[in-house]
Amino acid sequence: HWAAPDDSIKIFYTGENLAPDFNACDYAIGFEWMTYEDRYMRFPLYYRYPDVNELMENRHLQDLDAVKKSKSGFCSVTVSNFNRDPMFVKLFDKLSEYKKVDSGGEWRNNIGGKVKDKLEFDKSHKFSIVCENSAHSGYTTEKLVQALAANCIPIYWGDPNVSKVFNPKTFINVSDYATLEELVEYVKKVDADDDLFVSYLKEPVLLDQQYCKDVQIGLLRKFIHNIFTTPLDKAQRRNRILSGKMYIDDRKKQTGSLSYRINKKYHKFVWDVKTNLRRLYWGYKGR
């Protein structure tokens, strides 16, 4: 995007844990809890999964006795990204000391192969490990929504402010416990008590209807509509002169330099090597 003309309107969008740089874009859509006039809208990645959101929003209206009877497994996890936060590995190992955690992805697969339908796989389990790639305020992804839609109790680690949107009575927050041992003891308690388990399913997932998918998609449409119906000269928001122009010119030079391109390729190479080594290691251990 650095090569785009200076008078172009730039809209930053991310599905990753990245904050927008308003020196480089006019508008942004992301995960951050922030307001910036008409330049920013919070629209987490999980809203791009409307069917799953609908299941999640209505899960407390189901026949909960039937849901309880459908649970034949203890806990599920479906992960194929081998570059995980260390907390995820620790949590998996600690829960596995209590009961087998069924891993249906490439990572530590222990069920004989990758699952084809994650939602159906999760539906047969009482709990599901849900760990974000990193812990950052506002960074809640589809992982939590998918587990809730599958009528699991998510064992969640990630966004420290997840309870601004999601009802804390519908999931177990790892961050609420001083140690993983303490957490596992509570999971054991819920696992052994059917009434306590069902109490998590009885609660509405969202704390406020403003966070339901239909409302948020409507707000996104208004946000985009405002940008494209505003005359070009008035829609421009970022500084394009003096220090603003110098900032962009510097970034263009950096991203176009040989050292930048070499460094980028080097980091990708290292990332790929680490990923493949981890895949080989866990593939060998799983034999």
Regions inferred by a protein language model and the residue ranges of each:
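Pol beta-like nucleotidyltransferase catalytic core
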Residues: H1-D6, I11, A19-D102, G112-V130, ...
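Nucleotide-sugar donor phosphate/pyrophosphate-binding loop at the beta->alpha transition
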Residues: G15
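Short loop/edge segments at beta-strand edges and connector loops
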Residues: G105
